[in-house]
């Protein structure tokens, strides 16, 4: 089977949800691709005050994206930093934890189980939402103990995935990103990027890649992968003299924190199958055009997917898997400003970054 199908799979997996602070809609579609390698998480209430959303764009295979969709939010919850109110640090640790968990006999077994489940059912299962209601994903008692077995020396998967997640607690928004999936917020109709696309040609990324012994060819690390950060891809993380954040390819996420206000309209998380076809502002404008006329937020997402789908595979753009989550904030947001002293202290410790989204007040935790 080639990279593309003869006709696109346009069936969509969509869902909507709502609580007293926000509502969301999402949709995913395989499109022209021969396999569906996107995955996502949408959890309205991982605790009484906190929602979690994530998109994961797999490459070289699909199991790492599925693994992240199933386990990343669990590791956020399990973190001591999370208990202390430091959502950014909790997310930061969880990204690295994904690589650790996918090693050894236990990691091999979990990846095999996800792969078997995927292979036995149609490709649309790739968009499955892992939630406390639909799986055991809220079980925090598994300490991921070491297992003996024939795959005890398994170093990790050769395939990988981007990860872009948004954690909303009251009026605090924390975005963690590794790769080229993207998170965008609409404030008074203006699009602001809350993540940066990690590409090898970026100066800081290029410097790290070269120092780790890698090279860049045709915009790809070692001529292979067109991302500079991702979860998985163990073959690019083999320098034993370097820490995980210094490897030529790293899971190290950018962490950005935003104080939400009543000017904030909605939040979008999407894989590059969307961003290759529309700029951040174009997508925000498109959503504003349809959000008040469609019956649900997922219907808006479906419109976006249809808008991006190419009529043929000749042009390249519009031929990728597509996944999008749309989160709309309920007003007034100001009434949600119930931040504990521990949470405020954690946020205050994050330095303000000099970034391309600086017109909106963002605190950025350095990941270089």
UniProtKB/Swiss-Prot annotation:
GO terms for biological process: signal transduction. The keyword Amino-acid biosynthesis does not apply. SMART domains: PP2C_SIG (SM00331), PP2Cc (SM00332). One of its GO terms (molecular function) is metal ion binding. Binds 2 magnesium or manganese ions per subunit. Residues 336-368 are annotated as: Disordered. Pfam families: PP2C. InterPro entries: PP2C, PP2C_BS, PPM-type-like_dom_sf, PPM-type_phosphatase-like_dom. Mn(2+) 2 binds at residues 57, 272, 320. CDD domains: PP2Cc (cd00143). Disulfide bonds: none annotated. Keywords: Hydrolase, Magnesium, Manganese, Metal-binding, Protein phosphatase. Residues 356-368 have a biased composition (Basic and acidic residues). Transmembrane segments: none annotated. It catalyses: O-phospho-L-seryl-[protein] + H2O = L-seryl-[protein] + phosphate; O-phospho-L-threonyl-[protein] + H2O = L-threonyl-[protein] + phosphate. Its EC number is 3.1.3.16. This is Probable protein phosphatase 2C 58. It comes from Oryza sativa subsp. japonica (Rice).
């Amino acid at each position: 089977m080639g990279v593309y199908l003869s006709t696109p799979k346009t069936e969509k997996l969509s869902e909507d949800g709502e609580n007293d602070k926000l509502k969301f809609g999402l949709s995913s579609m395989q499109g022209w691709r021969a396999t569906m390698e996107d995955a996502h998480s949408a959890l309205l209430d991982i605790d009484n005050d906190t929602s979690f959303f994530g998109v994961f764009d797999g490459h070289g295979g699909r199991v790492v994206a599925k693994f992240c969709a199933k386990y990343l939010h669990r590791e956020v919850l399990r973190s001591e930093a999370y208990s202390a109110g430091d959502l950014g640090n909790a997310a930061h640790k969880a990204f690295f934890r994904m690589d650790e968990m996918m090693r050894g006999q236990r990691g091999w077994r979990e990846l095999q189980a996800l792969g078997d489940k995927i292979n036995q059912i149609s490709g649309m299962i790739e968009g499955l939402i892992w939630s406390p209601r639909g799986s055991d994903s809220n079980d925090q008692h598994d300490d991921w103990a070491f297992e003996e077995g024939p795959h005890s020396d398994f170093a990790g998967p050769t395939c990988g995935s981007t990860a872009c997640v948004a954690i909303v607690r009251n009026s605090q928004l924390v975005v963690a990103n590794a790769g080229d999936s993207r998170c965008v917020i609409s404030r008074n109709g203006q699009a602001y990027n809350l993540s940066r696309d990690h590409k090898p040609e970026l100066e800081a990324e290029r410097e790290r890649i070269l120092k780790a012994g890698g090279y860049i060819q045709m915009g790809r690390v070692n001529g292979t992968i067109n991302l500079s950060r991702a979860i998985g891809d163990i073959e690019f993380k083999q320098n034993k003299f370097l820490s995980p954040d210094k490897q030529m390819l790293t899971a190290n996420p950018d962490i950005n924190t935003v104080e939400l206000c009543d000017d904030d309209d909605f939040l979008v998380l999407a894989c590059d199958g969307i961003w290759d076809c529309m700029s951040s502002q174009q997508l925000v404008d498109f959503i504003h055009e349809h959000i008040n006329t469609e019956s649900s937020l997922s219907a808006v997402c479906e419109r976006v997917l249809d808008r991006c789908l190419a009529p043929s595979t000749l042009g390249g753009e519009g031929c990728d898997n597509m996944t999008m989550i749309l989160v709309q904030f309920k007003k007034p947001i100001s009434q949600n400003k119930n931040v504990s002293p521990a949470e405020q202290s954690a946020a205050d410790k994050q330095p303000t970054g000099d970034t391309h989204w600086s017109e909106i007040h963002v605190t950025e935790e350095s990941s270089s």
